[in-house]
Design a protein with these regions (language model features):
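Intrinsically disordered, low-complexity non-transmembrane regions of multi-pass membrane transporters
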Residues: 2-27, 31-101, 130-170, 249, ...
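Juxtamembrane and boundary regions of transmembrane helices in multi-pass small-molecule transporters
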Residues: 56-73, 128, 132-144, 179-182, ...
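Membrane-lumen (extracellular) interface motif
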Residues: 90-98, 104-126, 160-163, 175-195, ...
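Interfacial/capping segments of alpha-helical transmembrane domains
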Residues: 143-145, 190, 215, 220-223, ...
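Core transmembrane alpha-helical segments of multi-pass membrane transporters/permeases
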Residues: 219-239, 259-293, 423-450, 483-490, ...
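Short amphipathic alpha-helical coupling elements at transmembrane boundaries
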Residues: 244-255, 300-314, 323-326, 340, ...
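Alpha-helical membrane segments and immediately flanking helix-loop junctions
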Residues: 310-366, 370, 416, 491-592
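Transmembrane helical segments that form the transport core of multi-pass membrane transport proteins
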Residues: 425-526
Length: 602
């Protein structure tokens, strides 16, 4: 039809024009009109009549009924109503929405094809949705929730004086009853480990800074958290399978660093195992951790773990957050989580911050120890269990005598590629520090062994070495953790390596013992034991899982002093005590592991 007729009247800004097409109605059906020579006349400032000399009308009949036009009008009305919000919608929000929708579509498709194969992805997705909804719910109704629980909170505070002793007694009775029934089935090794745990608590109390002012809630709740985690992870099938699966996934993930090492160093990079195999894992993991920090995952995870310890143990937000952070990052990085607040924390909090760093290992070196052949699941479990242990020991060894004043806020900005690059660059110093320390300590150890052998030869004892001396010193401590008496001498030597040098040398030595056991062969060669039982290996893995050594002592003093110069004197005064507390925290974790381990008497 070539006609000239008024198509529409109204405000020109509201003219329903879309890509040279006009939607209109004729009788009960939709007409889609393509126009040319469009003209208009302004009758007043509000109304405009549009004319078209050449109008090509396409009649679609019953295929497009009237309700489609209503839907179109509803969409236009919605856009007009929310035009401000739509105009200022951020593109990143749109990208996130599209990405989440695509991800959910992939999850649904994968579960439809093979649910068993997609079960890990499904579980991770459900957990992510749960925590996102939980955060939204808490953020929106936080005041109402606090008001709802405030009467119960006030009642607990009034009754806490006697209630805390009832809970502590109940916890002790439950552990003792469980030990009695469990020992009748599995032997007396668990009792030795539990006795070692009690021994370390008593020793910390005897040498406490203020033994009469100990707050027992963090102590008993920290040990209770250790037992709960140990039982869930080591004695329940679901917990053991979950952490075993996590350990395997971490080990598989870290093996991707081999691609970069192979490209840079060539196909025979494993000929220099430590330099070209182990250290690239540190670089790769540091990069990944930096990226996770950028996207906010690490802050969220550390915050949740820290909140659990803060609520359950009654520790302050600063020390709880740092203890949680030490599960994933190193002892010099975790204080950066609370950097603005370090000048204002109490001496006990400062001691707890340093103890948490000494009692755990960094995620970046976790992969290096795994590459030695040490169990990834046990290393992961040890890192988690030592976090509450560090706070328990710290509050026992240096009780709080001041009033904490600090609350927390957070923030970090960086783009993803910058975060990845920054993580890789940061790892340069870490890798260099590891390499030079291993070189210098091994050289020093060789010199000490040679000198001690010369001295021992004067008294017809040429086999005198630094390891032997450490073995005799730490042998009682290793035995009280639950290590077999025949293996306690070897584990004592490993503890000496870890304390006076670093845990790298100790885990390297432990890996050789594990390899000797896996190869089989004679247990004794020339009167020297070549490997240990599996139980002793696992307990040693837990006992060595920490940065408590003299090399780290200087690192912590220098790092914290640069962050909080006003606390220089307090840092220097409490650092050595914190190292001892971190060592004992690792020993207590090993005792708990020895108490709940499934292994029977060899």
């Amino acid at each position: 039809l070539n006609i000239t007729l008024p198509l529409w009247t109204g405000n020109a800004r509201d003219f329903p024009l879309k890509r040279n097409f006009i939607f209109g109605t004729l009788r009960s059906n939709i007409i889609l009109s393509k126009f040319s020579d469009l003209q208009w006349r302004n009758f007043d400032q509000f109304n405009t009549v549009f004319f078209c000399k050449s109008l090509h009308v396409y009649y679609f009949g019953v295929f497009f009924p009237r309700h489609l036009e209503k839907r179109y009008d509803e969409v236009c009305e919605f856009c007009k109503k929310h035009k401000t919000r739509i105009r200022y919608t951020n593109l990143p929000d749109i990208y996130i929405l599209v990405s989440v929708t695509a991800y959910l579509a992939v999850v649904i498709a994968a579960c439809t094809l093979n649910f068993q194969r997609a079960l890990p992805l499904f579980v991770v997705t459900v957990l992510a949705i749960f925590f996102i909804c939980w955060d939204f719910f808490i953020a929106k109704y936080e005041d109402r929730i606090a008001a709802f629980f405030s009467p119960g909170d006030r009642y607990l505070k009034k009754q806490w004086f006697w209630l805390k002793w009832v809970l502590c007694a109940a916890l002790i009775i439950m552990i003792i009853c469980w030990l009695i029934f469990d020992t009748t089935k599995r032997g007396s090794h668990q009792l030795i480990s539990f006795g070692g745990l009690v021994m370390y608590v008593v020793l910390m109390l005897i040498f406490s800074k203020y033994p009469t002012q100990v707050a027992w809630r963090p102590v008993f709740s920290g040990i209770g958290m250790q037992f709960i985690l140990g039982i869930l992870i080591l004695r329940t099938k679901v917990g053991f399978d979950v952490f075993n699966w996590l350990g395997i996934q971490i080990q598989t993930f870290l093996e991707y660093s081999d691609a970069g090492a192979k490209f840079v160093f060539g196909d025979k990079y494993t000929d220099h195992f430590f330099a070209f195999k182990v250290l690239p894992i540190v670089v790769f993991f540091s990069t990944v951790m930096s990226m996770l920090y950028h996207v906010g995952f690490m802050q969220w995870l550390v915050g949740k773990v820290g909140w659990i310890m803060h609520v359950f143990m009654g520790t302050t937000p600063v020390e709880s957050l740092v203890a949680a952070g030490n599960i994933f990052v190193g002892q010099t990085e975790s204080p950066l989580l609370v950097r603005p607040y370090l000048p204002y924390i109490t001496k006990s909090e400062l001691h707890a911050v340093m103890t948490a760093g000494f009692s755990t290992i960094a995620g970046s070196v976790l992969g290096a120890y795994i590459s030695f052949g040490v169990s990834s699941s046990h290393l992961l479990t040890a890192s988690i269990m030592s976090a509450p242990a560090s706070l328990a020991v710290s509050k026992l060894f240096w009780p709080e005598t001041e009033k904490p004043l600090v609350t927390l806020r957070s923030g970090i900005q960086m783009n993803l590629l910058e975060a990845a690059s920054q993580g890789a660059s940061t790892s340069i110093g870490l890798v260099a520090n590891i390499a030079v320390n291993v070189i210098s300590f091994l050289a020093l150890l060789s010199f000490l062994d040679s000198a001690l052998s010369w001295v021992g030869n004067l008294f017809d004892y040429p086999q005198l070495t630094f390891e032997n001396i450490c073995a005799y010193v730490f042998m009682p401590f290793s035995f009280m953790m639950g290590v077999d008496w025949e293996d306690s001498f070897i584990v004592g030597g490993l503890l000496g390596y870890k304390t006076f040098f670093n845990e790298f040398l100790a885990y390297k030595r432990l890996s050789k013992l594990i390899q000797n056991r896996e190869k089989g062969g004679s247990m004794y060669i020339n009167g020297v034991k070549q490997y240990m039982t599996v139980r002793s290996e696992v307990i040693a893995t837990y006992a060595l899982c920490g940065f408590a050594n003299f090399g780290s002592l200087g690192l912590v003093i220098g790092g914290l002093t640069s962050i909080a110069p006003s606390k220089k004197k307090e840092i220097a005064d409490s650092a050595f005590r914190a190292m001892i507390a971190g060592t004992v925290a690792c020993f207590m974790t090993a005792c708990v592991a020895g108490t709940v381990l499934r292994f029977g008497v060899p």
